[in-house]
């Protein structure tokens, strides 16, 4: 859960990124908000488990640090969080989780206040999809039906209004799009009628155009005025817990305020009762020339993609591709249960390498393989073999297969017999 929040952990204290501004005298000022967990008089290490289970007698403390260059650091009094919220309900929070949510709310509020002249410009990374070709059962457990939308193969973009009234349009990686004047002009008109604090989340796209062409147009400094902005979600930095179905209702109201837009569109929503309906819609969308479908948990919050966090409240449905690639090495996962579990390394004809997760091996088998497979055994039995790989798509930048999973070797090989 820690990776859901911007910032880093140091000496058992989690600090959000500095929000910088400028004093009247022209000096650089920094404001930082931090969270620590106290057990009596001891600072505890913050772990992911604390977001789901309370530690007995532990309290969380929120405090801020403020300093001007060449000046002393001023530390605020701590705000203590002694219990979570919504106890006994599905959306209950622990002490630590609630403290982080409170701190994030204050962080976003402060960032928004400073967004005018001297700021990080209020960029919040958009929510990313976790589930691929799987719709969690939890999506159907609530009274509100999940939402399905067409998946366009375009370039992700988020729009917000700056403190000076200008429009900021930025990418998934928080890079500003400098062109797209046709879209920014309409956004400026739209923001005259709506809450200026709202972020519009969508995709830059033109139907039947390849992603590489779209990316080139999106990043061009000279505006071609061909791309359109398809908005599929909205959020407020201080109301990230607002459920998806309510955000969609507000998004519909936003577009009702100005119905003569040419380059900005609200994505159509479809409610579904079960997974079969979602799959039928996916098939329909693909026939229409789209990439597939996106499924949204109707009660899911907006979870920004800080530290490349992928939200479990989104699922992507699209056809799988497959191809054979040459196996050249092996490695292990880097964190969590993947640490110590074997991963294959394949190579493209241009010598670029990428990691592939074995699809049909259990974690126990993957642990055993990594422990017992030696470089000599790998070179003798596996090096240079063709591996059949399923993947979602090729990266438009590198050509590397994304979300790659190894189905098996082209020639029958039982890797467990090698060890």
Swiss-Prot record:
Specify where the region named AD domain lies, as residue ranges: 121-317
Q: Where is this region: NTD?
A: 1-120
Which residues does UniProt call coiled coil? Answer: none
Residues at the catalytic site? 151
GO cellular component terms, A-Z: virion component
This protein's UniProt keywords? ATP-binding, Cell cycle, Cell division, DNA damage, DNA recombination, DNA repair, DNA replication, Ligase, Nucleotide-binding, Virion
Q: Where is this region: OB domain?
A: 318-419
Q: Does the keyword Iron-sulfur apply?
A: no
The protein's annotated catalytic reaction(s) are: ATP + (deoxyribonucleotide)n-3'-hydroxyl + 5'-phospho-(deoxyribonucleotide)m = (deoxyribonucleotide)n+m + AMP + diphosphate
| InterPro entries the UniProt entry points to | DNA_ligase_ATP-dep_cent, DNA_ligase_ATP-dep_CS, NA-bd_OB-fold, NAD_dep_DNA_ligaseB
Please give the PROSITE patterns that the UniProt record associates with this protein: DNA_LIGASE_A1, DNA_LIGASE_A2, DNA_LIGASE_A3
EC number(s) recorded for this UniProt protein = 6.5.1.1
Q: Where in the cell is it found?
A: Virion
* One Gene Ontology molecular-function label: DNA ligase (ATP) activity
Task: List, in alphabetical order, the GO biological process terms annotated in this UniProt record.
Answer: cell division; DNA recombination; DNA repair; DNA replication
Pfam families associated with the record: DNA_ligase_A_M
Miscellaneous notes for this chain? Answer: Consistent with its intracellular location, ASFV encodes its own replicative DNA polymerase and three base excision repair enzymes: a class II AP endonuclease, the repair polymerase Pol X, and an ATP-dependent DNA ligase.
Described purpose of this protein according to its UniProt entry: Very low-fidelity DNA ligase that seals nicks in double-stranded DNA during DNA repair. Together with the viral repair DNA polymerase X, fills the single nucleotide gaps generated by the AP endonuclease. It is not essential for viral replication and recombination. Displays a very low adenylation activity towards DNA with 3'-dideoxy- or 3'-amino-terminated nicks compared to regular nick DNA.
Per the entry's comment, what about the domains? The N-terminus domain (NTD) plays a critical role in DNA-binding, catalytic complex assembly and catalysis.
Entry similarity comment? Belongs to the ATP-dependent DNA ligase family.
Protein name, per record: DNA ligase
């Amino acid at each position: 859960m820690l990776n859901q929040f911007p910032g880093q952990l140091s000496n058992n204290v989690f600090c959000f990124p500095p929000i910088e501004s400028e004093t009247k005298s022209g000096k650089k000022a920094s404001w930082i908000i931090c969270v620590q967990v106290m057990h009596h008089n001891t600072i505890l290490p913050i772990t992911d488990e604390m977001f789901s289970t309370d530690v007995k007698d532990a309290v969380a403390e929120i405090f801020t640090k403020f300093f001007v260059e060449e000046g002393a650091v001023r530390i605020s009094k701590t705000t203590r969080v002694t219990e979570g919220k919504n106890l006994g309900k599905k959306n209950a929070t622990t002490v630590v989780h609630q403290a982080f949510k409170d701190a994030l709310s204050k962080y976003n509020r402060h960032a928004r206040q400073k967004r005018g002249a001297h700021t990080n410009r209020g960029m919040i990374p958009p929510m990313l999809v976790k589930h691929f070709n799987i719709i969690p059962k939890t999506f159907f457990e609530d009274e509100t039906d999940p939402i399905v939308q067409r998946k366009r193969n375009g370039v992700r973009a988020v729009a917000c209004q700056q403190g000076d009234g200008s429009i900021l349009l930025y990418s998934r990686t928080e890079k500003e799009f400098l062109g797209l004047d046709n879209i920014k002009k309409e956004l400026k008109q739209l923001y005259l009628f709506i809450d200026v604090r709202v972020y519009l989340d969508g995709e830059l796209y033109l139907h039947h155009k390849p992603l590489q062409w779209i990316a080139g147009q999106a990043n061009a400094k000279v505006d071609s005025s061909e791309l359109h902005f398809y908005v599929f979600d909205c959020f407020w930095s201080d109301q990230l817990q607002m459920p998806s179905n309510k955000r969609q209702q507000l998004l519909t109201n936003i577009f009702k305020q100005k119905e003569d837009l040419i380059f900005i569109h609200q994505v159509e929503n479809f409610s579904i009762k079960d997974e079969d309906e979602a799959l039928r819609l996916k098939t329909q969308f693909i026939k229409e020339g789209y990439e597939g479908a996106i499924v949204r948990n109707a009660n899911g919050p907006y979870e920004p993609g800080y530290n490349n966090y992928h939200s479990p409240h989104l699922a992507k449905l699209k056809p799988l591709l497959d191809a054979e690639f040459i196996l050249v090495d092996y490695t292990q996962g880097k964190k969590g249960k993947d640490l110590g579990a074997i991963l294959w390394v394949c190579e493209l004809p241009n010598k670029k390498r990428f990691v592939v997760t074995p699809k049909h091996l259990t974690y126990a088998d993957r642990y055993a393989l990594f422990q017992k497979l030696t470089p000599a055994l790998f070179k003798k039995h596996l090096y240079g073999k063709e591996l059949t790989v399923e993947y979602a798509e090729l990266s438009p930048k590198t050509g590397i297969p994304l979300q790659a999973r190894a189905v098996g070797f082209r020639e029958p090989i039982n890797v467990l017999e090698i060890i």
